[in-house]
């Protein structure tokens, strides 16, 4: 199996307080995770991150602080200037299951729904003083024999506990 390597991607466009920054991610490889360097804004001031493939949001993540909390729960270090968005199952020790759950943008003829475009949108709060998003890095690997058609799909399910009784958070 090919060894994953970190590759820089296109820089963000439209970075500013109260703006939506966009970066286009190249296709043709299997993307394991995406690392976004940031400064000039707190994690709470990075309001929403969307990963868009073929014009459809495949991951909609509310707040970099939530991403950081999930990453710490999974065993990663706290985001110290770098936000990590996982496409593969982090913590899986076997290479096969990790490979099958990553974002596959290869041109494998066995894949029914080929991903032709990938981009990342980041909403920055207007209270951020001088936000800077560095060039994102992607951990990628080349195509292997079997296609990866499983995808980690993060969605937000809104729930307002204010008017309800007791509830359990799991």
Predicted features along the sequence, with ranges:
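Beta-strand-centric surfaces of beta-sandwich/beta-rich domains
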Residues: 1-170
């Amino acid at each position: 199996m090919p060894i994953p390597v970190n590759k820089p991607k296109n820089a963000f466009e439209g970075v500013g307080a109260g703006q939506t920054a966009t970066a286009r991610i190249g296709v043709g490889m299997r993307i394991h995770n995406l690392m976004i360097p940031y400064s000039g804004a707190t994690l709470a001031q990075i309001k929403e991150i969307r990963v868009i493939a073929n014009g459809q949001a495949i991951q909609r993540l509310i707040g970099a602080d939530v991403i950081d909390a999930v990453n710490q729960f999974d065993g990663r270090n706290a985001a110290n200037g770098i936000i990590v968005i996982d496409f593969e199952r982090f913590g899986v020790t076997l290479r096969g299951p990790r490979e099958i759950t990553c974002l596959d943008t290869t041109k494998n003829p066995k894949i029914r729904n080929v991903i032709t475009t990938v981009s990342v949108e980041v909403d920055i709060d207007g209270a951020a003083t001088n936000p800077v998003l560095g060039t994102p890095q992607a951990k990628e690997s080349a195509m292997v024999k079997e296609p990866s058609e499983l995808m980690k799909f993060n969605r937000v399910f809104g729930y307002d506990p204010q008017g309800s009784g007791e509830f359990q958070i799991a």
